[in-house]
Amino acid sequence: MFILRDLLRPLQAHFSDTDLGRERSSLFAYTLLAVIVPFTSSITSNLLRSLVTLFGIEIKKKRFYTFMASSTLPWQKLWQTVWGLIPSPETEGRLLVALDDCINPKIGKNIFGCETIFDHAAKANQSQYPWAQNLVAVGLLKQVKGRWACLFLDFRFYFAKKTIDAEKVTAKIKGVVVPFQTKLELAGQMLIGIGHYFPTSPLLAVTDSWFGNQSLWRPVRKVLGDRFHILSRLRCNSVLYAQPDASQPGQRGRRRKYGKRLGSATQMAAEVRQKAKTYTVNLYGKDRDVCAYDAVVMLKTLKCPVRVVWVFRK
């Protein structure tokens, strides 16, 4: 419990010294404890039940739900305090961060950040257009007991342009509509913030193919420089190009940006499979042998040299 006290006090210090601030500070700490205690799943109704049953806190349901849906919590200060509490964030000399977007379904109609969103991953018994919050989140990847774990470092609410143009109540903070930003812009802001907080650590963002393009790469690379890299999945139909040849003396015109067309990632996989080598990697908590081949090529989605790794099943 002393460890929890030392972790929670720096977080509580960011709340104001008013009656409301002290109430929120205490409620914030106890809510975190309710999440940690293996009592039940961490949905809002179960957290309220934990506060009442385990900690004896008397609070009205509407009051607690208002607190949980608050748009004025000092998240930026809280997140930076959390970053400072991580004892050894680096893995082999660099920060590994996962980047993705997700949705958080809700029921209340006036909850901040909510709108009708298309869920491309909806199951057969789920609505494809749930009423939910759309989040872009970044988390720190660390190995815990031989398996990879993700510790959230930051998040942003994403609003569709039509929601902001309509000035919906769920897109307002203190009566002011939030400015529109794309998911890539939100992700770039978070990565730049993390890079500034850890000014000497190389930063590797692990993401899917949707975020792996120059709209994220270029602005973050411009600020963080060579410290920033992206590891993303590659679409099977992505076209690969060889690196351009060096300019010859007396050659007219500018140097070519791309070399010859090599084909799609799938076509290249068939050609390089015989050249694959066996590597031992830690996969799902065990050291396993994996066949892989890599090559440096050019991609028009990033407009720069990219190392592509093909991993083959045995």
Task: Name the predicted role of every residue range.
Residues 1-18, 106, 110-111, 145-150, ...:
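Single, function-defining residue in the core of a domain
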Residues 39-116, 193, 212, 217, ...:
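Electropositive nucleic-acid engagement tracts
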Residues 3, 7, 24-25, 56, ...:
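Non-membrane alpha-helical secondary structure
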Residues 37, 54, 72, 92, ...:
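Short gly/ser-rich anion-binding loops that grip negatively charged ligand groups
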Residues 67-162, 277, 281-282, 292-296:
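Active-site-proximal, Lys/Arg-enriched surface segment
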Residues 18-28, 125-131:
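Structural motif
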Residues 29-39:
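Short, amphipathic alpha-helical "recognition" segments used to contact nucleic acids or chromatin
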